[in-house]
Amino acid sequence: MKKKVRTMCHDCHTKCGVVLTVEDGVITGVEGDPNHPISEGMLCTKAFSAKEIHEHPDRLQYPMRRIGARGEGKWERFTWEEALDTIADKMKEVIEQYGPQSVVTAQGTGRACNAWHYRLQSSIGVPGFALAPTHVCLLPNLSQTHVTWGRMFHPHEACDYRRAKSIVSWGSNPIRSRQHSGLRILDSMRDGGKLIVVDPVFRDIASKAEVFLQIRPGTDSALALCLSNLIIQNKEYGAELLTTWSNAPFLVHPEEGRLLRETDINLDADPDADHYVVWNSNTDAPAYWLPEVKSYNIDDVGPVLDGKFTITTVSGTNIECVTAFREYANYLEQFTPEYASEITWIPADRIVAAYEVMISNKPCILSPYLGACMMSSNAVQSGRSITILQILLNPPVDEPGGILFNPIWDVTFDPIITMADQVPGQHLRLGYDKYPMYTQVYASSNWPASIWDAIETEEPWPIKVLACIATDLLGCYEHPQKIHEVLQSNNLELFVVMDYWMTPSAKLADIILPAAHWSERCMGDEEVIPDPCIVTIPQIAVDPPGEAKDDWYFWREMGKRIKPEWWPWDSTEEMYLARLKWFYDWPEDAGWDEAVEKAYIQPTNAGATRIFKQHEKGLIEFKTASRKIEIYSEAMPVYGYDAPFPTYAEPAEGPLTTPELYQEYPFILTTGARDYPFYHSAWTNIARQRVIEPWPYVEMNDEDAARLQISDGEWVYVQSPRGQIKVKARVSKATLKGVISLPRQNYKDDCKELNLPGYDWDQANPNILIPTDGSDPGFGCTPMRGTLARISKAE
């Protein structure tokens, strides 16, 4: 029997719509779904590998438990019920003896399981994600938008590309990493839109750029601050947006490094109220902004955006106060194109050229991604500097061609599904004091490196159970040498892995569980692109091999065993329908068949039907302390940063911060660039993918290669103070001189069909070279993009 099955690829975050042809239980065809509102029929090679992945002989098929020493490779099969009972019993034992914080569940990129993982952690007794790589992926940017806008959204996915007149693709190559974004950028260009690309390596989309800015990794905030300075110096900013919807007009206390309050200047002020002070041009006197009612204390206030005023305090002394806008502008004055050029290695005239394109072609939107604001020593402040640059550009907020607010994060982290409001315990996150922003924003987890330390030392508390779903710890995190050691520690009493394959981490597990591929399951999450914001209802196309189960099955069955009253569902379909009813006004009597027929559904609880300028219509609000967009954020110093506005800091390792180390390791290393055929560490064992990029490699500049007598295709060592890997040199003019770039994949798996070797977790893994120390002060981001290394011929 032949049938067409509409589903969704999960091989990367793009999550394209797919139509699979299935004949007698066998996948015989793969095509893009032309009716999918986001991918519009587009697919890449990963989706076309569905049949190969589904039928791959190396797939895990049955639950197994270890019968020899960890890593010895001796296993015996047992049932799912036995496996789940064993895990749950151990979790309950540990919770009773040590507390819920000693049980850690882990996930990878969370393409379909964020909310349910969160709910299980709440069931265990500690809210948030116990372990996820969010310290370098997505959350640094989401968190800075939360601080700035009072709304959590990802600027890269919040861009109305097709209606923009100019686009800055910043630390991103969407042709490879977010094809739907790349498609929309190209559509804008066909309509006359201009493209600027910021990247240390000239890749795909850079060939279409009006201006290409080849930047030193880790210095993105210096570029953003320079562009902001040019906008302010030339008065190209949007004064109305800044004056009406941001806290830029608020006055700054000159001695205390905070915003002035009514209590500072009015003896009759309510001491418990946080009322901010502006200078009212209509009365030539102070006025007060009241966030609790989102209005001023009097009618007809004309806040002055840029100025300096003498204010008399309650003590009778006079202080000179500038507006928050002027405070930031004063800091920016040092960031001339020439100064930014010295820092970023971008010629000053190229910076000016980019500025002129942005100003001359509005609306201009900025599309920053991992390289710009998530994987560096200054990640959060880089994100803030780019976000405020976007605000200054004034296209902008919830308008055609600008930034669009997306309800996905409101849905994903709503307490209805996460149960986070039912569980206290932020202080039970490792790293709570060291990296307050990371561990205290919602959706956060333990700071990852602290988990490895806690397993080893059992301080400040022991970690006794570690369950990893869809993540390979040895391929995912920095300095895996340490992780490999602690996973073999007797202090860790139970280590569980659920995956497609016998990964390097799975080889060290006590229990391994087989995971279902997207062609074999019907789970999914909301799409992150905002226009349209949808959830796709995927169908099961084929039966999984053996007894493989979907991830939601694990979360559900563990939840039933630990806190059954929070887990009333008996199937993945029932869980999906519950979400539709919570967030999508799905009829109570409508079942799974009706959902499948509907195919694509928009959320209703957050204004998903595109209504522009929602903030002006009162449909959404900025949930900051001031109920304004916060250019000046008093939360930032609380979280460990040096200023309430964005500042530049040199990378933790580099020619200026560690000059002696730079002499020994004279290249700036950036890691993690996407490749067409792979996603993170996945798919190097799939022939259709591996044939495109058969060998691990490093990109380097041809002049650097000539100086070191390294030829294109030659095996080389890449070394950092942390370790060494062996890869092939890819020599060209594409890479900035003095920079070397390693892609994300670690080539851990062999490809038997092509007779190509695998390199396990420690031979070609870029993370071997990356420090575990969190160099971003409040968030603990590590410098995956912008640390030091050297390169030499391999023996």
Give a label for each model feature.
Residues Y98-S102, G238-L242, I365, V397-L404, ...:
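Flexible, glycine/charged-enriched surface loops at secondary-structure junctions
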Residues M1-E240, T244-F309, E320-C321, E338-Y339, ...:
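N-terminal export/assembly segments and adjacent metallocofactor-ligating motifs
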Residues H117-L186, D191-I196, A222, E292-N297, ...:
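Extended redox/cofactor-interaction regions of prokaryotic respiratory oxidoreductases
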Residues V104-R111, Y339-P347, Y369-S377, I408-V411, ...:
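Conserved short loop/turn motifs at secondary-structure junctions
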Residues R66-E82, N229, K235-A348, L430, ...:
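N-terminal leader/propeptide and maturation segments of large enzyme subunits in energy/redox metabolism
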Residues L84-Q101, E157-K165, Y331, V352-L366, ...:
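Glycine-rich phosphate/diphosphate-binding loops that line cofactor/substrate pockets in enzymes
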Residues S376, D551-A595, I686-E699, E703-E795:
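Long, contiguous, secondary-structure-rich segments that constitute the structural scaffold
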Residues A158, S519-P544, F554-W555, G559-R561, ...:
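Glycine/threonine-rich phosphate-binding loop and adjacent beta-strand/alpha-helix elements that clamp
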